[in-house]
Design a protein with these regions (language model features):
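Low-complexity, glycine/proline-biased repetitive segments and flexible coils/loops
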Residues: 1-175
């Protein structure tokens, strides 16, 4: 599984590095888009950045499985929402090995795939969550979850709080 991209507050995430074992190479994950930018393509795609200011719009998640190989390397990142100014602006979740970003809800990273290499019930290569924090309900102010399989949680709103790193040795993407 290729590595996830590094994140920095307020900037576009870097795409991850390729991972090679013998003759098998897995493409690194695409970096997530920052505010008003699309996510990058990669083994698993990065999520689309949220919009801000007076420029509403939807920004695309990066394509997964890039370059296209068999078996599939990962899924696409989710798109950001296009809410008008003053309402919640949410970035897209990163793609995971098993499902695309946003499959389980806006900002949510896609789930990774189960594998029995280290025993049953082990999941790898979850996508990182999109930036922002929950604004309503009992979890108001809490970060969004990364996908099952080590995906990192989101940072806070406003672009000033970095997301969480993916879990070590799982191939999970950072939030």
């Amino acid at each position: 599984v290729g590595g996830g991209g590094a994140a920095a507050p307020g900037s576009v995430g870097a795409s991850g590095n390729d991972s090679t074992f013998s003759t098998i190479t897995s493409a690194g994950g695409g970096g997530g888009g920052s505010e008003q930018n699309n996510g990058a393509s990669g083994g698993s795609g990065g999520g689309g950045g949220g919009h801000g200011g007076s420029t509403p719009g939807i920004f695309s998640g990066g394509s997964g499985d890039t370059p296209d190989v068999d078996p599939n390397q990962g899924n696409s990142g989710g798109n950001s929402t296009g809410k008008p100014p003053g309402e919640t602006r949410r970035a897209g979740g990163g793609g995971g090995a098993l499902e695309a970003g946003n499959t389980d809800g806006q900002n949510q990273g896609g789930d990774g795939a189960p594998n029995t290499i280290l025993g049953p019930d082990t999941t790898y290569a979850g996508g990182g969550a999109g930036g922002g924090e929950q604004t309503d309900g009992p979890l108001s102010g809490a970060p969004f979850a990364g996908g099952a399989g080590g995906g990192g949680a989101s940072g806070g709103s406003g672009g000033n709080d970095p997301g969480a790193a993916g879990t070590a040795n799982t191939g999970g993407g950072g939030g």
